[in-house]
Amino acid sequence: MTSIRKSHLTLKALNESMIDLPAPKNISAWWNFGSLLSLCLALQILTGLFLAMHYTSDISTAFSSVVHICRDVNYGWLIRSIHANGASFFFICIYLHIGRGLYYGSYLNKEAWSAGVILLLLVMMTAFVGYVLPWGQMSFWGATVITNLLSAIPYVGENIVQWLWGGFSVDSATLTRFFAFHFLFPFGIIAMTLVHLLFLHEKGSSNPVGINSNADKIYFHPYFIYKDLIGFAWFALFLITLVLFIPNLLGDPENFTPANPLVTPPHIKPEWYFLFAYAILRSIPNKLGGVFALLASILILLIVPILHTSKWQNFAFRPLAQIFMGLLVVDVAILTWIGGMPVEPPFIIIGQIASFLYFFLFLVFFPLSGWLENKMLESCTKSSALRALVL
């Protein structure tokens, strides 16, 4: 008799995605971040739902409602802290997931990679509108500065900004629609996650050595289910430690002050996980050029599969590419640091150099390393063939 999980229409799809899914037996802990992102998404939706029950999206009461949640709602402080710090962990997992995809050549599955980049954009938009909701100083001024960038679009920019604001400045209408967006976007994220998984499971996961593993696969359950549970345990440990001991570590002190349009903070900046893109934006003196650079810093991931020139899928056997990958990690860390610094020397020139290097690595160094490694491989192959002929 066929098991119900293999015959029932709904359970069959779940079974093929989580239980009987054939997975390469040699995938490492770097492949855990996909499941961790699912956990993060579920956690954010659950905590966000409870916060939405007590939050009011009006500029006169928004800040007070957040204070009310923390002071008067049972475990409200815990729910808010998990939601705020969970967003940071969400982006840590996303960036590590993207880094793994770059290193191990997962971008060669173009459909899954493109769906992943769209997912990244959706998550970034969700996080941005969510950052505005507490209506603190940095929330207000961050919303004003970032949304005002749309005015750089020729001809229609000013109209788009006013439409987004719901008036001539960031006000109650802006907060209401940002709350609506923040509530709705996660459903779009869920839909794109399913598309991402659909394309991923169509071809199967990559593996650390970058070769076809069809002849050597095992069931996802129980082996990788338990492996993922270990990742969940570590994730919970780090998140709860941060939430209970240093919950405000990754936040901005300015957000403890209610929004005041008459007082500008000395240094306006977004959350830490957007700082690398913000640094690239600030490195271009022209407003429209800065907006293009900001978008390009994310959308450049879409052309990574096109720029792949190596005969190897991943960087595991490519020493030159490994050096450039290390440079990229350091460069993003420098950009994140620069994004949190004031716009003054020497931070301006450091940011411009780091921004140039960021694009140069993707557009020149990675394709060049593949081409050089191919030439070295051909040279070694020819010399080996000649040696064999001589012998």
Swiss-Prot record:
Comment field (misc): Heme 1 (or BL or b562) is low-potential and absorbs at about 562 nm, and heme 2 (or BH or b566) is high-potential and absorbs at about 566 nm.
Chain residues that bind heme b b562: H83, H182
Cofactor(s) needed: heme b
CDD domains reported for this sequence: cytochrome_b_C (cd00290), Cytochrome_b_N (cd00284)
The protein's assembly and partners: The cytochrome bc1 complex contains 3 respiratory subunits (MT-CYB, CYC1 and UQCRFS1), 2 core proteins (UQCRC1 and UQCRC2) and probably 6 low-molecular weight proteins.
Record-linked PROSITE patterns: CYTB_CTER, CYTB_NTER
Listed transmembrane segments: 33-53, 77-98, 113-133, 178-198, 226-246, 288-308, 320-340, 347-367
UniProt keyword terms in alphabetical order: Electron transport, Heme, Iron, Membrane, Metal-binding, Mitochondrion, Mitochondrion inner membrane, Respiratory chain, Transmembrane, Transmembrane helix, Transport, Ubiquinone
Keyword Metal-binding: yes
GO CC, one annotated term: respiratory chain complex III
Compartments, as annotated in UniProt: Mitochondrion inner membrane
InterPro entries per UniProt: Cyt_b/b6_C, Cyt_b/b6_C_sf, Cyt_b/b6_N, Cytb/b6-like_sf, Cytochrome_b, Cytochrome_b_C_euk/bac, Cytochrome_b_N_euk/bac, Di-haem_cyt_TM
Membrane topology: Multi-pass membrane protein
Sequence similarity: Belongs to the cytochrome b family.
Protein name: Cytochrome b
Any one Gene Ontology molecular-function term assigned to this protein's record: metal ion binding
Lineage, highest ranks first: Eukaryota, Metazoa, Chordata, Craniata, Vertebrata
Function: Component of the ubiquinol-cytochrome c reductase complex (complex III or cytochrome b-c1 complex) that is part of the mitochondrial respiratory chain. The b-c1 complex mediates electron transfer from ubiquinol to cytochrome c. Contributes to the generation of a proton gradient across the mitochondrial membrane that is then used for ATP synthesis.
Residues annotated for heme b b566 binding in this entry: H97, H196
Binding site for a ubiquinone: H201
Gene Ontology biological process terms in this record: mitochondrial electron transport, ubiquinol to cytochrome c
Cofactor binding mode and count: Binds 2 heme b groups non-covalently.
